[in-house]
C-alpha cells in the first residue's frame, strides 16, 4: 500500500476586517473596549489587523455581540495567490 502525504505550504490567510465594521458603525476603539470589557490593546490589535497567531473566540464573541454583527463580518478568508485590491 502506498501512503502519501500531501503538504500544502500555501493555504491562504485570514484577514481581520474589524476596522471596516467599526468605521461603518462610527464606533471608536476606546468605546468598543469599554463596551466589551476588553483592554484597548486587544481591540487595537484586531482593529489594525496586526499579526496574531490565533483568534480568541471569547474576544470575537464579545466584539460581535456589541457590534451586532456576525463573525464573517470581521474575519475574511483570502485564498492563496489572491492579492488584496
Where are these regions (language model features)?
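Short C-terminal boundary/hinge segments that cap the last helix of small helical domains
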Residues: 68-83
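A short, Lys/Arg-rich alpha-helix, primarily the initiator
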Residues: 1-28
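Residue-level detection of the helix-turn-helix DNA-binding "recognition helix"
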Residues: 23, 37, 48, 79
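Recognition helix of helix-turn-helix/homeodomain-like DNA-binding domains
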Residues: 38-53
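Short, basic-rich loop-to-helix N-cap that marks the start of a DNA-contacting helix
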Residues: 50-62
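Short alpha-helical "recognition helix" segments of helix-turn-helix
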Residues: 32-33
Amino acid at each position: 500500500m502506498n501512503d502519501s502525504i500531501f503538504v500544502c505550504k500555501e493555504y491562504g490567510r485570514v484577514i481581520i476586517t474589524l476596522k471596516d465594521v467599526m468605521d461603518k458603525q462610527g464606533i471608536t476603539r476606546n468605546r468598543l473596549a469599554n463596551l466589551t470589557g476588553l483592554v484597548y490593546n486587544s481591540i487595537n490589535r484586531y482593529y489594525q489587523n496586526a499579526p496574531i497567531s490565533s483568534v480568541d473566540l471569547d474576544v470575537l464573541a464579545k466584539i460581535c455581540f456589541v457590534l451586532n454583527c456576525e463573525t464573517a463580518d470581521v474575519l475574511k478568508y483570502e485564498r492563496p495567490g489572491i492579492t488584496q485590491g
